[in-house]
C-alpha cells in the first residue's frame, strides 16, 4: 500500500468531485446566488428541458437552504467519494458479486453494464424500470450508457442501504440527482479508483483514503 499515492489520489478525487458537483448544480439551476424555479411535471420537475425526480429535487432544495451552496458541494462530493470507494472495496473483497466499479478484461466500462440483468437487484426492479434500462443499453450511445450506469449504481446503493444505511442512502435524497458525470471516460475517476484500490484491498486502505480526503 503506497500511502503517498493514496494521498495524492484522495486529494485529486476531492477536487474533481467538487467540480463535478458544481457543474451538476449549475445544470439544475442552483448557484451561490440562488435557485432557478423548476417546472413541476407530475412526479418530476423540468429544468432546462430535462426531467428529474421531484422527490430528489425537493430534497436537494431543502439541503441547499439548510447548509448553503459551498457546504452542499463539499458534502455531496464526499458522499459520492465514499460510495464509489466503498463499492470498489466491497468488490475487491468479494462482498458483492456485481462489478459496479471494476471492468471485465480490457474494456473500460464497469462489468455491470454488460450483465446487469443477471443480478438479483435488477430482477427486483419493477418491469417499467427494467425496460428503461434495456432501452438505454440498446440505444448504446455515450449518454445512454452513462445514464444506464448511473441508474444501476443508484439501485445498488438502494439495495445496500438496508444493511449499510450509514454509507448508502435510500432513493429520494438529494444525492441521487448529483451523480457525478464522466465516470466512463478514459482516465476517469473510476479508472483511478481501480488502480488505487486494486484487486485485493486491505481494510485499512479505506481508512487511509478517508483520512487523506479530509486532510485538505
Language-model features: locations:
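Preference for the N-terminal adenyl/adenosyl cofactor-binding alpha/beta module
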Residues: 1-216
